[in-house]
From Swiss-Prot:
It is a multi-pass membrane protein. The keyword RNA-binding does not apply. The chain crosses the membrane at residues 42-62, 71-91. This is Uncharacterized protein Mb0906. Pfam families: DUF2537 (PF10801). Keywords: Cell membrane, Membrane, Signal, Transmembrane, Transmembrane helix. It is found in: Cell membrane. Its main location: membrane. It comes from Mycobacterium bovis (strain ATCC BAA-935 / AF2122/97).
Length: 94
């Protein structure tokens, strides 16, 4: 029988895709959040939480699909990196 575990995992391609997705998502989240922070900081925090809460169930379902799991990894790393960058930018302005 051909089991899914017998297939080789394309680490190089998958990590390249995840890195690209992470970069695009991180830039998008930082740029949009910086615009929202100018309006009101709580608006930026609230909309980030709503966006992540809405995306999380979909991404959680995709995490076991062979191709889509790399997008999930990239999205998670991108959002986490963007939040850390926003935190550093916000605390650095103080």
């Amino acid at each position: 029988m051909n089991d899914q575990r017998d297939q080789a995992v394309p680490w190089a391609t998958g990590l390249a895709v995840a890195g690209f997705v992470a970069a695009v998502i991180a830039v998008a989240v930082v740029v949009l959040s910086l615009g929202l922070i100018r309006v009101h900081p709580l608006l930026a925090v609230g909309l980030n939480i709503v966006a992540v809460s809405g995306l999380a169930p979909t991404l959680w379902g995709w995490r076991r699909t062979p191709v889509l799991r790399w997008f999930v990894l990239g999205a998670a790393v991108g959002v986490a990196g963007a939040w850390l960058a926003l935190l550093a930018l916000t605390l650095g302005d103080g």
